[in-house]
Design a protein with these regions (language model features):
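Terminal domain-start leader segments
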Residues: 1-15, 55-109
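An N-terminal JmjN-like helical accessory module and its immediate linker preceding a catalytic domain
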Residues: 1-43
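An anion-binding catalytic pocket shared by soluble metabolic enzymes
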Residues: 2-6, 12-13, 98-169, 186, ...
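N-terminal leader/transition segments
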Residues: 8-9, 44-54
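Short, surface-exposed beta-strand-loop junctions and turns on beta-sheet-rich folds
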Residues: 16-17, 24, 158-159, 293-295
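Contiguous alpha-helical scaffold segments within structured protein domains
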Residues: 49-75, 79-82, 104-105, 149-247, ...
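Short coil/turn segments at secondary-structure boundaries
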Residues: 94-99, 125-130, 217-218, 234, ...
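Conserved hydrophobic core element of enzyme catalytic domains
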Residues: 213-320
Length: 320
């Protein structure tokens, strides 16, 4: 259950999409993309909050009643946190993201109200057979404009004043810069803003640079999975993934979805990482959230942050 798939599919419009689950090997993307598999029942929608639309898995307008089926205890989370804390102390990791979950039985399939839960964030729903991952606050990952301006996104930290959250964001940005320098990319414009995800606020950094489109596949191999979702250095995070992932596994959480084609807003490529969302299957709703960990944080603080994120996600479907 909750196992990710991997595919590159061709949409009816001719656009190509790559979907890769976390921690699984996949080939680099060439331009144009290699078509590996065509899934007729695979549906994807990527919209902006300015689009006035509500996405429903059913047309039901009934209140959504969720009955808790399972959740990770604090003691379980704390034991995983202790292992990762040692890795941070020994400087094997400069940042790690520990994810947790709650699983509910739903009375009706949930729907998302995109407009009321986001400020300037991409919104999406993705479906493969009877499993749906959808949410109102994923992370933008990489975009490329028609004039070959690349934009990398980093969203990290939930406090506007905390020095620890500031460090978390700095680690995320510097990890991307380190990878870009390996490609000889040294001229990078960095801008920061505050992004709202439900009731939470995050520091949002955008790294803009010019590069050849042929670098797309190599860049994705180098910077995905990003530190904002799993940790840094990523190789060391992978060695500890059993302590980072939620009890039921990652599923679609953290997976990369990219679309190559021409968009009305002047982009040639846009991609998102599937986080802060819900997995829905047979009226089971799984909510997953992770928190970025650096030195000098406690298990209590990080577990509480995860609970706030879980609550925010549930709020995006009108449940609590």
């Amino acid at each position: 259950m909750w196992q990710p798939n991997e595919c590159i599919i061709q949409l009816k419009s001719g656009k190509l999409l790559k979907f890769a689950g976390p921690f699984i090997e996949y080939e680099s993307i060439d331009v144009p993309c290699l078509l590996l598999k065509n899934l007729d029942d695979f549906k994807l929608r990527i919209l902006k909050p300015s689009v006035i639309e509500e996405c429903s898995l059913t047309r039901s307008k009934e209140p959504i009643l969720l009955k808790l089926q399972s959740e990770e205890s604090f003691e379980s989370y704390k034991s995983r946190f202790a292992v990762i804390s040692k890795e941070l102390e020994w400087e094997r990791l400069s940042k790690a993201v520990i994810a947790t979950e709650k699983i509910f039985q739903a009375s009706t399939l949930p729907r998302l109200n995109y407009i009321n839960t986001n400020d300037d964030r991409i919104i999406f729903s993705i479906q493969n057979n009877d499993l749906v991952f959808f949410g109102a606050t994923p992370d933008e990952f990489l975009e490329i404009s028609k004039d070959h301006i690349f934009t990398l996104y980093s969203v990290a930290g939930t406090s506007l004043t905390s020095s620890v959250d500031k460090l978390e964001n700095e680690v995320s940005v510097s990890s991307m810069m380190n990878e870009l320098k390996k490609f000889g990319i040294n001229s990078v414009e960095i801008t920061q803003s505050v992004a709202r995800s439900g009731e939470l606020y995050h520091v949002k950094s955008m790294l803009k640079f010019r590069a050849n489109l042929s670098l797309l596949g190599s860049l994705i191999d180098a910077i995905y999975p990003p530190s904002t979702i799993f940790g840094y250095p990523i190789k060391n995070a992978l060695r500890n993934k059993q302590f980072l992932m939620p009890p039921s596994g990652y599923g679609y959480y953290g997976s990369l979805v990219g679309v190559l084609g021409e968009f009305d807003d002047g982009l040639l490529f846009r991609s998102i990482c599937l986080i802060r969302g819900l997995e829905v299957k047979n009226h089971l709703v799984r909510v997953i959230a992770g928190s970025g960990i650096v030195k000098n944080r406690s298990a209590e603080q990080e577990f509480e942050e995860c609970q706030l994120k879980l609550k925010s996600i549930l709020g995006s479907i009108g449940a609590s």
